């Protein structure tokens, strides 16, 4: 070859590599309202991790509403998860953390298809993790958003404060926050992250007017909060609740300052007792300052999912500003955002109970005792443990999901119900049904991360099916779109559910548990509603 031509070809090759490099760099960057970010590309998916959506909630910002991020100059690396929120990791967590927890934790993550540009207006999905409000984070491998991005979704996951960092009340906090932005800091974090999405997701190619929120367990309960909070107005257009209850019985809610007769203590009184346990007396400014100076480990204590039912921790509360009422009261009053909803539970979901006998168990149904016996134990020969679990699971998880779907269907909003009955091939000798949270790696199609060498082709097929339904719902509001098995809308008349079965894939059917849920609904609906919380002055959200 002529030397001159070699030089030209070499120059062209170098230019091509340079242009490719520039193109990749451009594709891996995004400009937010706080500064520029540089992400990473893996398998044709771009991710931006550890993106701050609020100032670190430390020091004087402990127990305050999320505050604006301090802008940065230059381009910030966004290639690794930032710390999950402060907690004592739970050894048998279904979603083990990938970071060391820290109080400085208000960060989110974004995945998108490679080559996505600002203005592409891809649908957005916003994930809220579970963990009983004391555990969880956005770093677990099973929460990786890559498979959603591969389906044309801009996927977002965000941290929120946990334990006493996320839920805490104290008399001086009430005095210094007359606008009512107190107590439920975890929910404020979720709203702040959604507001960040509204302001910034277009820079990542997402459509801020097409956001679907979804969460599991405590994350699902959080979705109920968002559906019924005035501060979440307009931040999303669809919602998915996985094993998140739907009445007032999941979050253990209480009021900030008021203790109800025969009800739980006020959150403030719990905060005062916690302060005393730390050697801090009084309820004024000096006491609050001392509380804010406590080491994070002291505030955290030993709280996790195994120890959360202990004195000194309030959990979610009704504050009259962020959370106006428990979900059941809000839904029955018509105080929820009119959006399509998809809800469901697992076939062996949470159902713990302590009734010592069948007589005690069925006595709890009052005048519906006979109907309950016929629905749950028609032969009278079922083991107590199995019947007790089914009764408590239905009351805690399954019937509340149907209740919410019924409310939305009555408002002519699309509502869809699922039951996840599939059990991984490697776990079938151990699990008689699908336990709580086991649907997550199928929804995310991260079964490889969950089961590794024990993964079977059937597991992968179910994961692909569930992912496709969730994506279809996020894109169109109808999970049937593009899927081989139609998912009928739920109505009280048809009671149709989509069962992700152990052996037959997705099956749409009339709910075989209808009689169980009907009798459970009869006793739950007859319970007196919770009274309204004390009034607080209305004010606009800070962010």
Predicted regions and their residues:
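Short, solvent-exposed turn/loop segments enriched in Gly/Ser/Thr/Pro and often Arg
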Residues: 161-164, 214-218, 419-426, 485-491
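Non-catalytic accessory segments of hydrolases
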Residues: 2, 25-184, 453-466, 475-484, ...
